[in-house]
Amino acid sequence: MNDCWSEAIAERYSLALSDDLRDWFDGDWNRFDCSSEFCDFSVIPSLMDAAPSCFWPGFMLPDTIPIIGNRFGDWLCLKVGNDGKCCEIVHWYHGGGDYIPFGRTLAEALLYDACQSVSPEHQTWGEVSEKDPSKKNILEWIAPRLGVSMAVLEEIVGLYARGHVVEATDRLLEKGWCTTVAARDRIDAALATPLRRKADPKLAMRLGVTWEKEMNRWLFDTDLIPLDQRERLHEILGSSTDGFAQDWDAAEKEARAVLAHRQDLGWAFDIAGWAALRKNQTATAIDWWWQGVQTSVFSDQSTRFRSHWFDRNFGKFAAQQLHELRELLPNDIAMDPYWSALIATEVGDASQRITAHWIGRASQVGLSAGDCYDDWYRAGWDVGCHQVDLFAMILDQLAQNGRQAGWEAKAKIAKTYQARLAQRF
């Protein structure tokens, strides 16, 4: 069987592959063993198909290529830049289409996967795949590509295994590896409480509150728990006062660190804005949320952070928070067409309103092909689009405008998603 696919895949998608990806596609995917969550490397040959079955049109980001699966529907995907190079590896979640960047390179992403797979809350993934004695440990592939010894990687993985998230992520951040997802984990650790680990819909029912709205709101910020319910929770769970303690200052610090380097992830804005509001820094909160509301809803990690208690009519957590502060919004926000589309809750759902907004923007005369591509992208992946016929048009426009902008790789990826959509429907 031919294990060498780098040249064919690079030509198929007009990719400028890095050395580590060339090594991976040229057989390393079939020579190393992985017992972490993402252990299905067998998809590589199928990427040459006209409409690969691993492509999920309308769900996966249209500039990503799935390359490693977890056999439960999630994928590690290459995210491709305008120049055809892989700019990062993202974990795409099939249960909603959310994504989180794992690292700039495949080596970083596989290292983080090894870490998360042994963490106490994630240990069940260790049973996904038995070790193959004929293949090498995946850490042996990662180590030389990150320029360190196996011992360095084993120390970091070991810290995750013992639940020492802060110490483990200290090591990652010192090396500049997996920086975004490390910050995500540090925020999660800062806001984690015994209550979050023990809460479930049955507990909400026992307290006489709704799970989706009220209980998740309390889990997001325990200061929102009414005093009488705190007393009941103490009785039921036997927890101390510390059972509700969160470190919002630490969470804010990590969110701001992410935002200093990138502005495309909704969860960082959500956390930074809420932390500011808690300190009565309303203008700062509004500024963070106005930037955050313009990111994709698929970047918000709302289930992990328990921020999904917002009113779905607004489409996003940040949108509802801004609406709560609507009397204080500056005129440039209050009069913005995008904001008007978000809050027009009497006109269809958020998906319909926002998709229509971006299609209207993309259809304006005089826009560059690159700007059109960006607007069509947001038409499909701002708050999502639920109409198959519209998605066919969106993907077609992404392919056309990507090609006109000279972004051949993005054009070919969009065309592949379009072919898969036509095959499925």
Where are these regions (language model features)?
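Compact, glycine/acidic-enriched structural inserts
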Residues: 88-131
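A surface-exposed partner-binding patch
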Residues: 1-85, 135-425
